[in-house]
A protein has these predicted regions:
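N-terminal subdomain of nucleotide-sugar transferases
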Residues: 15, 29-119, 478, 482-485
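Carbohydrate-associated surface elements
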Residues: 229, 251
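Conserved donor-binding/catalytic core segment of Leloir-type glycosyltransferases
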Residues: 285-301, 307-310, 327
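Nucleotide-activated donor-binding/catalytic signature segment of Leloir-type glycosyltransferases, i.e.
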Residues: 330, 338-361
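Short alpha-helical donor nucleotide-sugar binding micro-motif in glycosyltransferases
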Residues: 361-362, 369-374
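Aromatic "clamp/platform" in nucleotide-sugar-dependent glycosyltransferases that forms part
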Residues: 382
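Short hydrophobic beta-strand element within catalytic cores of glycosyltransferases
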Residues: 390, 399-402, 412
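Conserved acidic donor-binding segment of nucleotide-sugar-dependent glycosyltransferases
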Residues: 414-415, 419-426, 435-441
Length: 486
């Protein structure tokens, strides 16, 4: 197998950024976020007992920290995935140490995220002002930091390496080779898939990423795909060995994302409108059609499609203007339409600025309330490996209007828990929004079905399946080592 050595110089040719000073505000936010996460440690399900599981896993997330608020910068579904999975693995006695790049000089070397889950900050490149596109040049420094942390332990400290996203995969490849441990990798997104589904004005993924992902696929002992379609894409685009690919659906925190906040469920015989209660808490009009966008503001997520669809709807049905409200909850990320001001200007040009409300990213508890309050969550994405937000909204009792791309057809049952649209024609989305406006009973009917559908996506099941993948990877790695040594 080709060794990793030549890869880092290739990746290092990308541009570098200037160094900025760390801000104490980030440290404060990280501290608050960790304290919130640490208050919950889910109990292990009795059935999640696996034979010869790993004792300790090194999890790698180079470009985004699990301590960052989802919806800001490059923090999104992958952050939620890592946090929830790590906590559930710890609950079944698999310790997890997460290595991530330090983005502030004042961060401690390590932070306990939850019992059995440790986050290690690695110094690699400037703390701030470093775009994700510049990170390949810092992979050598990040790898050095990971090796330094490992050097303080006895051999065999980590039973397995689990890397997330292609940048982490290269570090994981080197670490796994050095430690004599198996490598499990999760792509989360793939360059070839993204490039085949680019939004207008978006930047194609570079050839270096395609080469890097191909090498990681070949080097991994096991690959985790969110859906069967993603597994097929790994085989079709990257020549992955089908025997090494395992499908594990991500989960949803069913304690947090539920029709009623925990502890507020109505008693026997009591009738309470969960949507009305959420709207009252958020100060939203009770009788409005509320199509919600929640996520990072970037071309890939296509929030502009929602705005254009609303403009089409109001052109056809101007009387709806007085009873429609379009919240856009999220922060800037990526390229092209990265700044909220770009969407604000678009709303003004379309003549709908009066019905659109831009809100910054919110914590998970308040996000759940936004889901409960919405008539429908709108996800017109050009590419989604799974779409955690779709499952979270459904768990909260809200239907989803989504593009029929990636894992969204798995997350959303078309016609039952929401609607899927082929392509990205705003008029097609406008037609579905008109259905919700003309048939108010659609939201509660589909919302009830959505909440039931989401029950099958718990994180305990995802952790159990992931632990099975770990066990298979360890056994395969041991067999390969034995065969190489006669």
């Amino acid at each position: 197998m080709e060794r990793l050595g030549p890869v880092f110089p290739l990746l290092g040719g990308w541009r570098s950024s200037s160094v900025r000073h760390a801000r104490s505000e980030e440290e404060r936010l990280v501290s608050q976020y960790v304290s919130r996460l640490g208050r919950r440690s889910p109990a292990a399900s009795p059935r999640l007992r696996l034979h010869r599981r790993p004792r300790r896993v090194a999890m790698l997330s180079v470009h985004t920290s699990p301590l960052h608020q989802p919806g800001t910068g490059d923090a999104g579904g992958m952050n939620v995935y890592i946090v929830e999975l790590a906590q559930r693995l710890a609950a079944i006695n698999i310790e997890v140490e997460i290595f991530t790049r330090a983005t502030s000089g004042g961060l401690p070397p390590s932070v306990q995220l939850a019992p059995g889950v440790l986050v290690r900050h690695v110094d690699a490149g400037p703390y701030e002002g470093l775009a994700k596109e510049d990170l390949p040049a810092q992979l050598c420094a990040f790898t050095h930091g990971v090796m330094q942390a490992w050097a303080g332990h006895r051999p065999g400290h980590y039973d397995l390496v689990h890397s997330h996203y292609w940048l982490s995969g290269h570090v994981g490849w080197l670490a796994a080779q050095r430690w004599g441990a198996p490598l499990v990798h999760a792509m989360h997104t793939m360059a070839k898939v993204k490039n085949a589904n680019l939004a207008d004005g978006d930047t194609p993924e570079p050839a270096a990423r395609v080469i890097g992902e191909t090498q990681i696929v070949a080097a991994s002992d096991r690959l985790i795909a969110n859906t069967a379609e993603e597994a097929d894409e790994l085989v079709r685009h990257y020549a992955a060995d089908p025997a090494k690919v395992a499908v594990v659906h991500p989960g949803v925190n069913l304690d947090r994302f539920r029709p009623f906040p925990k502890g507020t469920e109505p008693g026997p015989g009591e009738r309470v409108d969960a949507r009305a209660a959420a709207r009252a808490r958020l100060g939203l009009p009770q009788d409005a059609l509320i199509p919600l966008f929640a996520g990072r503001i970037q071309p890939l997520k296509a929030p502009d499609i929602l705005l254009r669809a609303v403009a089409v709807l109001l052109d056809e049905r101007p009387e709806l203007r007085s009873r429609i409200l379009v919240p856009v909850v999220g922060g800037p990320s990526g390229s092209g339409l990265a700044k909220p001001e770009g969407l604000q200007k678009l709303a003004a040009r379309l003549g709908i600025a009066d019905v659109v409300r831009f809100r910054p990213p919110v914590g998970q508890e308040q996000l759940a309330d936004w889901f409960r309050a919405a008539s429908v969550l709108v996800m017109p994405s050009y590419s989604e490996s799974f779409g955690l937000v779709a499952i979270e909204a459904q768990a909260a009792g809200t239907p989803v209007l989504a593009a029929a791309v990636g894992g969204l057809p798995v997350a959303v049952r078309d016609g039952h828990t929401g609607r899927l649209v082929q392509g990205h024609d705003p008029a097609a989305y406008a037609r579905v929004l008109r259905d919700f406006a003309d048939n108010p009973e659609l939201t509660p009917r589909m919302g009830d079905a959505a909440a039931r559908h989401a029950q099958s996506f718990g994180w305990d099941s995802a952790a159990a399946a992931t632990a099975d993948v770990y066990t298979a990877a360890i056994h395969a790695h041991r067999r390969r080592v034995r065969s190489h040594h006669g």
